[in-house]
Structure formats: C-alpha cells, structure tokens
Amino acid sequence: MSIRRPQIPRLLLQNVSCMRNAQQILRHVNVSLHDGGALVLTGTNGSGKSTFLRMLAGFSKPSAGEILWNGHDITQSGIFQQYKLQLNWISLKDAIKERFTVLDNVQWFELLENKIGKAQPALELMGLGRLVKEKSRMLSMGQRKRLQLARLLAIDRPIWLLDEPSVALDDEGVRLLEYIIAEHRKKGGIVIVATHLPIDIEDAMILRLPPRFPRKMTLIDMLDRADIS
C-alpha cells in the first residue's frame, strides 16, 4: 500500500516579517493556501494589509521568512518571472484610462495578455454592458470599481490579490464581487482579500492584523491632557 504524500501548498508563507520606516509591520506570519483557497486580511488602517499584499505581489520583500510558490522562493529572479504571471492585482489605484471607452479599457489589457474575447462577457456580468461605448471618465466610483472587476475576469489569472475590492460598491456590486470570487475558487483559483468592510467568502481563512501605529492625537486629546488651572 503506497503512502500518499501531503500536497504542497500553492502559496506558503513561513515566519514572514516585514519592516516599514524602521517599524515592524508584520511579525512571524504563517499562512498556507491550496488551490481554491481564500484568505481575508482585516485590521485597522496602518496594520499592514496593503503591505501584506504588496509582498505577495513581489513589490517588496519580507525582512524575514519566506514566501513560497509551488515550493519555490518568489524572491528568486527566475521563479518570480513565472510567479508574477499567475497574479491579478486590484488596488485603490484603478489604472483606468480616462480617454478610453469602457470596452477599450478591458480590451487593452486583453491585448497585453494575448487573451481576446472575454471583455464583453465580463462587462455584461458586472452590469456594465450598456456602457461599453461610454468614456471611462464618465463613470461613477462604483462603476469604476466594477470596471476593475471586469478586467480581473477578462485577464483570468489564477491568483487574485484584492485590496479593498468592495469600496464604492453598492449592495448589488458586493454580491457580484462575492459571486465572482466563489466562481474563481471553484476553478481552483486562489483569492486573497484585504478589507475593512464585511464580505462573505465561504470557508475563507481570516487573518486579523493588529494595529501598529498609535492614533494621531486630536485637539480634544490635547485639551484633555493640558493642565489648565
């Protein structure tokens, strides 16, 4: 009888720490994600949610520990070139080209990826089908977020890194976001979300990052502390 070896996690963080401006942001974080897995990062502003995602995207390196993809350290140049092709990133900077139409904004990224034909269906799914010929500068904040999500669907990479993806979305938009995350995971995709807003992701691991920066003192605080006689 053969013994089945445990499957290697697709993504593995081992004792990962991170410094920013000489201050410890993340300390000894351990996370493993297999195909279809999801991780939700929560915490106050300044707790390191975006820093965590930036490390996973390879924009910065951990000060200690390792981030492994398929068992290989992503900071190794040869590995990183393969790893970055697995990533799809959404941040608060939407990278929307104002002079392009809604459709062109998605098709432009399709051309870069050599993936054609998914732009229109993705926009339809995200409720932007009637706006495909509109200039992107005319979109509301919620519609811009939907456009980002449509681009995510059209490019269709296996690992999604989503920084505050539900910001500016109405209730219907949040439900669509939850739906496309669920569908992506059914196909074996991995989703990592940083958020301070409620979002329903079934069986997701929750990692709450503790606050790292003291709250700025307000005028009321100063008056309370002042020794006024």
Curated annotation (Swiss-Prot):
Annotated positions binding ATP: 43-50
Picking any one GO molecular function of the record gives:
ABC-type heme transporter activity
GO cellular component terms?
A: membrane
- Species this chain originates from: Arabidopsis thaliana (Mouse-ear cress)
- The entry's protein name is ABC transporter I family member 1
Q: What is the catalytic activity of this protein?
A: heme b(in) + ATP + H2O = heme b(out) + ADP + phosphate + H(+)
Keywords on record: ATP-binding, Cytochrome c-type biogenesis, Hydrolase, Membrane, Nucleotide-binding, Translocase, Transport
- Give the location in the cell: Membrane
The free-text function statement in the UniProt record for this protein reads:
Part of the ABC transporter complex CcmAB involved in the biogenesis of c-type cytochromes; once thought to export heme, this seems not to be the case, but its exact role is uncertain. Responsible for energy coupling to the transport system.
Q: Report the EC number(s), separated by commas if there are several.
A: 7.6.2.5
